[in-house]
Amino acid sequence: MRLLTDKLMLVGLFVFTLAEALTHYGQVYPDSPGYFAAAHFFQSRATPAGQPDFRLLRPVIPLLASLLNYFLNIRTSFAIVNLVFWCAGAILMFYFTKLLTNNLYAPLFSSLVFTSAIPMLLFADAALTDMGGYFFILLCIYLVIKWDIPRATITRVCVVALVLGVGILVRESVACALIFAVTWTLWSTRSVTRAATLFLIPLAISLGWSYAVGISYAAWYTQGGVAYAAAKQPLTPLHKLLRLAGNIQYSFGRYPEILLLGALGLWRNHEKNSLRIHISIWVGAFAIIFAWPVIDTRFTFILFPSVFPLAGLGLEEVYRIVFRTKYIQETWPSFTDSVISQYAFLLFVVAAYALITNVVLRHYVSLPWMPYTDPSVKLSSIA
């Protein structure tokens, strides 16, 4: 019965994700032409988008898009690659939450709000690398927990390290999963060998690629991070902290309901190892958030592997507080507390959340036959 329920939930999740993806499809933003150029670089041909420059430090998505580009136009190629990662990421979020919480309702809630979150609607299927980064963050953390990497064989540790290395070549923010893996390993078993393996293999992969293409991560950090922040976000430390707090809240919704549910879920969660996992995720995520000089929802959203599962636990606690009180039993005697009523409450909350995020981003609706292009992007650069 549980297996059938999971299958039905996964079908519903896939349909919902596809609906969100096809109404926020293939957006082109000011950064996109650089990724088009990176894709054309792998085809060894010139491009009207210009030089790929630092985007070559994120080669995986452009490489995959370049393969599809032999059959489809470049914009559609990126859209399809990211659409696959979006659907796979939503399903992985379901299984990850199930692994982390062992809860009946949290996996569905977590994966549904993940797929309708503001950064997902804005960037997941855009001609960028964000969705690939979110997928690999989730995949790496899932594997670390599933295989209990602090106590796993060295073979499994090496496999996870290789996946981390590939993930960092998708997007540098995947390094938050590396920091999580090292932190949790040292905290749980103090295994220096495993921690060193998890750190050194991804480092060798990323630096090896950097050397091969002749582009420095330090130069990218200086130009794309420090210089950009100085020009576009000249803030005092206090204002930067306030902006960061607001940005984290906005990453998870127009209003702070998801963060409040997450806080409630954390308060309810008393399992020691689970708390270690969440704290290790926060260490990794905030290390990247604070290290990158630019404040952006695309980076603050990397807290999602902790926030959404906790919010799922928090929602169940809200249901218990609201619908299992003596007051409800006395004033609403016909109400039946059942699995169906709990799922109905969950879907109501998800529908309200998705409605708000979609209304907030109504000007960014992007359909396959009428995709959104930022006004600052010249159509000649999309080729």
Where are each of the predicted segments found?
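Membrane-interface helix-loop-helix junctions at transmembrane boundaries of multi-pass membrane enzymes
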Residues: 2-4, 151-154, 189-197, 262-281, ...
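Membrane-lumen/periplasm interface segments of specific transmembrane helices
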Residues: 34, 190-264, 353-366
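Hydrophobic, aromatic-rich transmembrane alpha-helices
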Residues: 250-287, 308, 324, 328
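Short hydrophobic/aromatic helix or loop-helix immediately within or flanking a transmembrane segment
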Residues: 33-43, 51-73
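Transmembrane-helix signature of polytopic, membrane-embedded enzymes
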Residues: 93-116, 134-135
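Transmembrane-helix motifs of polytopic, lipid-linked glycan transferases
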Residues: 80-101, 139
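Short helix- or helix-capping micro-motifs
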Residues: 13, 107-116, 142, 164, ...
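Short acidic/glycine- and proline-prone juxtamembrane loop motifs at membrane-interface regions
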Residues: 29, 122-132, 296-297
